[in-house]
């Protein structure tokens, strides 16, 4: 089952046997039955959520017992689309925020993965690292 905002992208993804289109900033109700999925993977999306607490509660509802949520993000974003809690926080504060929301909405202590590529000079001679953060939590 897939979710997104772009019908053309979802149609081209052959992994999904079904999908739906929904803006979670307008409605956090997910059109799936209670305890109907085992995993929820959210990649490069959390940083745009205006109501992550509400959506996390809804994800807990649709996940099976001991279902897992996997949230992955980096320090990249369309900053004009991200809420203040994201734009005004450090990378470490963002990880702590996602952790707090998960725990307060029915998930166990998440496993936190942090990976960084070696810094490289970009065309402006600044050192850039490419961080990757992932939190994996199980529904209690």
Which role does the model predict for each range below?
Residues 1-31:
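Class I SAM-dependent methyltransferase SAM/SAH-binding core
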Residues 106, 120-140:
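Core SAM-dependent methyltransferase catalytic element
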Residues 68-99:
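Conserved class I S-adenosyl-L-methionine
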Residues 38-53:
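A short SAM/SAH-binding and catalytic strip from SAM-dependent methyltransferases
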Residues 89-114, 133:
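Short alpha-helix
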């Amino acid at each position: 089952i897939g979710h997104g905002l772009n019908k053309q992208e979802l149609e081209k993804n052959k992994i999904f046997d079904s999908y739906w289109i929904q803006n979670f900033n307008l409605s956090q109700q997910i059109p799936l039955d209670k305890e109907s999925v085992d995993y929820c993977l959210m990649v490069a999306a959390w940083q745009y959520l205006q109501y992550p607490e509400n959506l996390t509660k809804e994800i807990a509802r649709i996940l099976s017992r001991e279902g897992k949520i996997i949230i992955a993000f980096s320090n990249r974003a369309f900053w004009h689309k991200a809420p203040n809690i994201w734009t005004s926080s450090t990378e470490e504060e963002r990880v702590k925020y996602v952790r707090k929301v998960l725990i307060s909405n029915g998930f166990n202590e998440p496993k936190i993965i942090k990976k960084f590529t070696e810094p490289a000079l970009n065309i402006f001679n600044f050192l850039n690292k490419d961080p990757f953060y992932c939190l994996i939590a199980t529904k209690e």
